[in-house]
Design a protein with these regions (language model features):
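Short, well-structured N-terminal submotif of metal-dependent ribonuclease cores
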Residues: 1-33, 43-59
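A generic structural signal for short hydrophobic patches within well-formed alpha-helices
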Residues: 8-9, 38, 73, 118-119
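A general structural signal for well-ordered alpha-helical segments in protein cores
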Residues: 18, 38, 51, 73-77
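Short active-site oxyanion
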Residues: 27-31, 62-64, 105, 109
């Protein structure tokens, strides 16, 4: 499973349905996230005052963090052009979303997320 910021924040902040999402994480054979998504996650966690608990959660689940290479950056750009904020599509994917979607698309793994932005984009 490719991790998106929304999923990890929902679990950490115990948003409605968080237990089910945590079980999904526990059942996943692979947990992976883009370094671009990780950067967004850490910035958002810092701004919400939950950076240390988020770092603890990341240590517990220990996802493989995939570096952003040229291929992944180009894929994320392509996703942004189609579905990104300000591009006229209802999905309005943000920076971290584009990297999560690009990695899921490239590695052919399911995308773990909360909300309907990715659904609007067809993920």
């Amino acid at each position: 499973m490719i991790l998106d910021t929304s999923l990890l924040l929902a679990i950490l902040q115990r948003e409605p349905g968080w237990e089910q999402h945590q079980q999904t994480l526990e059942r996943a054979e692979v947990l992976r996230m883009s370094a671009g998504t990780l950067q967004e996650l850490l910035l958002v966690a810092h701004c919400r005052g939950v950076l240390e608990p988020m770092q603890t959660l990341l240590e517990l689940i220990d996802p493989d963090v995939v570096p952003v290479d040229g291929d992944l950056a180009e894929r994320a750009l392509g996703i942004f052009k189609r579905f990104g904020k300000g591009q006229g599509h209802p999905a309005q994917l943000n920076f971290g979303d584009c990297f999560a979607a690009a990695l899921a698309e490239r590695d052919q793994l399911p995308l773990g997320y909360i909300g309907d932005d990715f659904t609007k984009a067809g993920f």
